[in-house]
């Protein structure tokens, strides 16, 4: 958990690297654009605050769930001796308790991995340096949420508790949230025009796929043995996708940073003349795009085949809507990859000014990651997983989907414009208005909290500055009337008190004998 928190703090510091907010090139959104009367663009300092606030929201509930698990099971270990006995724990707290506990725990991974509706912080996090985006926001920080979910799933599987009713209910919710996030992220990536925001939207989509596929685990009995470990097929497929996504998306982010340096703009721009001048960037983009997009015969195709097989095999249990979301997200995803490639290297606006710095140093980094991404084609034939990926990939139906993805990729390369989305383009460019709604809700909550604390503060001030002094003043006036300094008067008071006490004592004796 300490490492988990360290990731959030690191991300906050790096997203806000240009905290002076003095360079529009580091902003996200069009400067001057408004949503509900509020700025639609985001500066680095505010993006950093948004990221840490969103992540801490989920971490707060996650920490509460961890504490509850520790108290109820007397263990905080996922694996090894003394690991949490999930079966006993779930039986103890019942279906509703299990679902509540898991949902509270998963709010941490959900916010960290930018699942809908906690996704906007990732999109505005693109104010940070591009190298930071390539590391934290494609391979490490955002993937940590998915990884923790995978570890949790494996731990529950090892305890034989994946079939618990509360687990089934919770994981069904996660399936649909993950796949819906995948579709929304893909649509956003297809429509927006900022290079890094496009890639952030696609990262959101990929994380949704990983979450959704992992959550299928309780509904499918297939497992695979790797060494001495028995792993649910769904978890393995999601983990392999995490690997190729990290390599391919890091490549695209690094290329994007080089493009921003070369063109002087964070928006899509570049034609084939730019591609000829930046050959390594162009080839690396193509390599990453076809690897990640699931076009055959690269690793992405076989892994997507595994996803199709996993989700389609449980359609009768989770509903065929999940499979429909997966197919739609995959189609839109490959279209965004082709559009990104085309608008920056083939059919985009001609670059009027090329700064020409960065050069070979930048090119070497993304050339290496692109080469490794292509090398992942060996994954389906290693690790003892051919039956998990190769068999589904050779199915005629899946081959047909792969061919369709190739056709879509080439078609969008030729005609990359998104005008066909019509009025929806504005919705996507404004990121589903989540930023504005969150700002309004959070601002309203903050204003209400501020007003409440102001009232409390005024009440405390009134108590100590007005009420108590007034009481002491009044009491002092009463005392002054009694304490006049005359001894004979004091003697009379004592005499009266003694007489009253004697009368009371006499009455008590008469009444009670």
Predicted features and spans:
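Alpha-helical transmembrane segments and their membrane-interface junctions
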Residues: 70, 290-306, 371-390, 459, ...
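Hydrophobic alpha-helical membrane-insertion segments
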Residues: 58-67, 286-293, 368-379, 447-455, ...
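Alpha-helical transmembrane segments
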Residues: 336, 407-417, 504-508
